[in-house]
């Protein structure tokens, strides 16, 4: 099993002639073995593009909310 060293996320957006936005999310996954995996997802919304990119990795995206404990 490969161990992930880093995941970089890139987001691109374009507007068409009717000012509709389209998104592309690129995930660049680097493994400790030196292998590189790139997945791209396209969509009408940022969430759709992101979900498609993560689906190509075979992973599900979990949004984490940072919580702080006050003592």
From Swiss-Prot:
Pfam families: Corona_3. InterPro entries: Coronavirus_Orf3. This is Non-structural protein 3a. It comes from Feline coronavirus (strain FIPV WSU-79/1146).
